[in-house]
Amino acid sequence: ENANTQIDQIENFITSGMDVIIVQPVDPDAIEEVCKEALDSDIEVVCWDEKMENSSFNWVIENYDLGVEIGTQAADFINEKFGDKGCEVVVLGYPQTPILLERENGILDALKEKAPNAEVVANQPAIDTTEGLNAMETILQAHPDVKVVCCIGGGGATGANEALKGTYGSEVPDDIGIFSTDLTDEAIASMQNGEFDRCVVAITGNAFVCGDVIYDLSMRYAA
């Protein structure tokens, strides 16, 4: 979550003489220079989820398009449940990171286009479960009629699910739903148990699948 931390980590990897460095940039512009140092030291640099100049190759997810799909799934749910009446919506984003801001913008644009009568009553940052829980609990106090929550990631979605369970208990209304990405174990369990997660847009699989794929690509490239 901090570009300076990533710079320090990459510098340490350079000093240690690593063969390959895999990075998911918090801020790609901020780490371009140190990644160039790695390349100049004959270290392969693999960038995941962003486009960088100073990398051996980039494995890119189109984050805006991913956000549009999350928002589209939420809009379909809104239109099915509420029609022209619309409903109150919460977005749990993370604008501190450029790629997640792109994803958030995709969600907002899709909601505006495809569910124009829905009202986004709160937009709060939530990158993990704790932030999602705290943000959603606070939002529900001010907006108890929220029906849809759109999240840029699985952590915020898990926290939102816990907050909604705290509000509604075991009675899960069929007109309330969480829409997100990241196929976490928690999201799968929520859907299997009939909780508040309605849709997870999974492009790359869970964190372990992503890790396996990017590692395999990196090793094949470096071979």
PLM ranges: what are they?
Residues E1-A223:
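A residue-level marker of the well-folded mature domains of exported/periplasmic proteins
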